[in-house]
């Protein structure tokens, strides 16, 4: 599902109350955006840091005016049922698809997840959606959107 990310020397773990993810803006610059909502937070955003691809397609995020974005990382971490950590490197040009949600002018980013491939399903049944910049239609997901 993606419980943490790393970009250069920076590691970000979802449980941290100030966790932010690096989102590529249209101009190519990186903006760090608050990652989802923690259980203890009081706000209107959905709890958690992940958005199932199926729920996006079903329209469950529509009220938050969602925008697809590129989460730029070098690697991400997943835990298995026993809590063992596994780090997975992204290849050059790959990114994690994110969903930028807006409520009352505030933005939060959620990692888009889908069913895991058979070779990784034993670690976790859901997996971040990894896309290749060259394969993405720039008008749809492409160069992302500004978080502000």
Located regions from the model:
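Short linear sequence motif anchored by a di-proline
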Residues: 1-148
């Amino acid at each position: 599902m993606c419980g943490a990310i790393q970009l250069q020397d920076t590691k970000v773990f979802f449980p941290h109350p100030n966790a932010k993810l690096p989102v590529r803006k249209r101009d190519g610059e990186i903006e760090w955006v608050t990652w989802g909502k923690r259980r203890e937070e009081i706000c209107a955003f959905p709890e958690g840091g992940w958005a199932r691809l199926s729920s996006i397609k079903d329209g469950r995020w529509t009220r938050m005016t969602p925008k697809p974005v590129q989460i730029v990382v070098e690697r991400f971490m997943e835990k298995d049922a026993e809590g063992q950590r596994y780090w997975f490197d992204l290849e050059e040009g790959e990114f994690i698809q994110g969903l930028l949600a807006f409520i009352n002018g505030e933005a939060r980013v959620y990692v888009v997840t889908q069913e895991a491939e058979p070779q990784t399903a034993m670690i976790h049944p859901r997996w971040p959606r990894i896309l290749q910049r060259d394969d993405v239609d720039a008008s749809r997901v492409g160069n992302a959107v500004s978080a502000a």
